[in-house]
Amino acid sequence: MIRRRTFIKGGLALAATPAMARAQGKGKVKLAYLQLGWAATEIIHKEDLLGRHGWQAEYSVVPGAPGPLLNQLASRNVDAIDMSFALAAKAFEDGVPLRVTGVATAVLGAIIARKDAGLSRVEDLKGRKVAAVVGTSTFFDIRALTLKGYGFDLQKDTQIVTATAPPDMVTLLGKKEVDAIIAWQPITDAVVLRGEGVYLAKQIDLWRKATGRPTGFPVHVCYLVHNEFLTKNPGIARDLNDAQRDAVEIWYGKPERAIEIVQDVTKLPKEVVQVAYKETVKMLSGLPDEQVDTLIVQLKINKEFGFLKSDIWENPDRIRREFFYRA
């Protein structure tokens, strides 16, 4: 079990940007997000979409792995964050006072094989060296789905090489020190674009095989709001979802602007962002009934395969009441 202090420890480098003073009658809100989160939160930031919904918003871009960002919410340094869904559930059961208020993007993960590693099937990974950021939701999700869909354990049946952040995995693959990596967009797309790796399996395909669900979108990134802030400002849940909806409209309706924003925040080459944009499974917003049903299945799988421990994940009514917040 990865305990809370293990995966949320670490420092934080914030690049805080006060939003423009537009229609700020609802008060202040601090929204932080991952630099490589790939959730359209960049668009909320650069277009100040929370400002359009009446908030005086301060946006912070957080580099690296998700742990330090989650720690910022737990310590109330920020009011809301984007976060991988599995880590959100883990933090909740470990006592972090948070609620899931909406979703941001469908699963982004993939297993990328080194081009000359001789891997053509997921089963070929047995006994091979695989790099992963072990504390991330992508690793745990893909491990659970591989267990359920293929019957073998990536953590036990391969040689896991632990990385601290996505760029480390890219370096390991480039040096041929590993045969494959378990990562997420846009890192996966950058590796493929450079010709160093090929897609062995995408997380969405692993999900469909493991669950037998041909429709619906499992979620990689969701929005979390600290309970204290949410209690005092319940309207933030609706407004954050509306801002995300606006961002998704820009993502699909104005792709050139979306790519420009993402490139500015991630600092990735334009051609990488363009490929990752095309490979994105689905940008999402809100918390509709059918999405909640899919999220509950995700939680059940993570409980079944040991990442989550609490009995709450076996009780859909409690999940809806205590973990989600629907405006």
Enumerate the language-model features and the residues they cover.
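Secretory targeting signals
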Residues: 1-2
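N-terminal export signals
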Residues: 6-23
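Short, glycine-/small- and polar/acidic-enriched structural segments
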Residues: 24-163, 179-185, 196, 201
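Short, solvent-exposed loop/beta-turn-alpha elements that line the ligand-binding surface or hinge
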Residues: 52-53, 204-216, 282-291
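Pocket-lining segment of extracytoplasmic ligand-binding domains
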Residues: 86-87, 168-171, 175-261
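Short, surface-exposed acidic
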Residues: 153-159, 266-277, 309-316
